[in-house]
Amino acid sequence: MTNLLIAYTGLALMIILPGIGSAIGVSIGSNATIGALKKRPDAFGNYMLLSALSGTHGLFGFAAFFIFYSKTVFTPDITPFAATAVFGAGLIFVVATYAAIRQGQICANGIAEIASGNDVFGKTMILAVFPELYSILAFAAAFLISNKI
């Protein structure tokens, strides 16, 4: 039973950690949008895309959750190895939490610059993708772990 609890804790981390990061990152971008709308309301489409970008990290966590939860190992007879693997895969997503928050900050800076009249939407999108890579790596690592249990 303890092994099953460890495994389910890992599953919960796959949702909780990137979900928290995405919520914080999106709110950082959205807060910047509120201020930017006062200066340039015509750029709302750009603001909205940049604000929403941090939400993708939560999707990576959910995808990993779905992959692991579809495995048939979640029974009271789960092995310590499998339980620890699921927990470790969930813990990996602390990377996505941090990446989502930092991506939100990058997007907020881009939003502020667009509001100031600078044409930096494309460049901001490019720079904001860099933290995304680390969430993708976390997802890839979780996927590889899932293939070993």
Across the structure, where does each feature detected by a protein language model lie?
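Hydrophobic, small-residue-rich transmembrane alpha-helices and their short perimembrane loops
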Residues: M1-I149
